[in-house]
Amino acid sequence: MSPLFVVLLIATTTFYHSDAFAVKRDHHMCDRTGKACLNNAECCRNEKCVLVDPNIRCFTVPCGTACVKR
């Protein structure tokens, strides 16, 4: 295995498993009150998570969806 192949494999794997692939970096999670979530449990305290886009429009998504530490 060439060193270049290994580097590409690691980079690709890291990219696909990072939250950057699932959620754009300019998005963040907050709970229903608009308070930013620190972790999945906090996001899901009210059984729903809220995804806030850069325009601060919130919409509910199923509990656990894209609830990642920011």
From Swiss-Prot:
Signal peptide start-end: 1-20
Q: Could you say which tissues express the protein in this record?
A: Expressed by the venom gland.
Any idea which UniProt keywords this protein has? Secreted, Signal, Toxin
Query: Where does it live in the cell?
Result: Secreted
UniProt GO cellular component terms: extracellular region
The parts of the chain that form a coiled coil are: none
Q: Where primarily located?
A: secreted
Mind listing the GO molecular function terms for this protein?
toxin activity
The answer to whether UniProt assigns keyword Secreted to this entry is yes
* Keyword set includes DNA repair: no
Write down what this protein is called.
Putative venom toxin Ts29
Which species does this protein come from?
A: Tityus serrulatus
Organism ancestry:
Eukaryota, Metazoa, Ecdysozoa, Arthropoda, Chelicerata
